[in-house]
Amino acid sequence: MYSYIIGVITEVHENYIVLENNNIGYKIFITDFFRDNVSAFDEYKVYTEFVEREDASILYGFSSQKERELFNLLTDVTSIGPKYAMNILSTMTVDECKTAIITDDIKLLTQAPGVGKKTASRIILELKEKIEKDFVPSEKPVNKEVKRSNDSEFAREALLQLGYFKNDVDAFIENTDISGLSIEDIMKKAMKSLDSSR
């Protein structure tokens, strides 16, 4: 129905946000990770998935296409509905979840509320082969201090001034190794990555 919605977050609640676009407020259910990284009255690009049930029509929101794709994979698993999929994505990152599935890490998967050993085993059984085929872990910063450095913060602010969305910029800095790069190089790398995902 909607691939994504660009708008201003007017409300942030425990498990959903209200995103205003063209004077319409969309109630969008989100993961804990997403909630903890957004601020009211900022503009965001929210990737969405519309789920229609007998008793309700619900819009789920994600910070990236990768997160939405994993949500859809999880909801395809027998007995895993949107609620449990969101619980999993609120407990671990996309890469952590995929790695847990590939390495048969039942212990990690069962950390998600409502996911027992039987359910975790079913997730691994049904998704392992699908995920193994094309899973490439995101680059991680070798030094967590790097992304908090003056250079990365300056580049972040500059990218926001250029009109890139906060969640996209933050995701780039979080998931990309920018150690040793100059501000100019960070900007070039970020713009190339962000432009290709638009």
UniProtKB/Swiss-Prot annotation:
Residues 153-198 are annotated as: Domain III. SMART domains: HhH1. It is found in: Cytoplasm. One of its GO terms (molecular function) is four-way junction helicase activity. Keywords: Cytoplasm, DNA damage, DNA recombination, DNA repair, DNA-binding. It comes from the Bacteria. One of its GO terms (cellular component) is Holliday junction resolvase complex. GO terms for biological process: DNA recombination; DNA repair. Belongs to the RuvA family. Has three domains with a flexible linker between the domains II and III and assumes an 'L' shape. Domain III is highly mobile and contacts RuvB. This is Holliday junction branch migration complex subunit RuvA. It comes from Finegoldia magna (strain ATCC 29328 / DSM 20472 / WAL 2508).
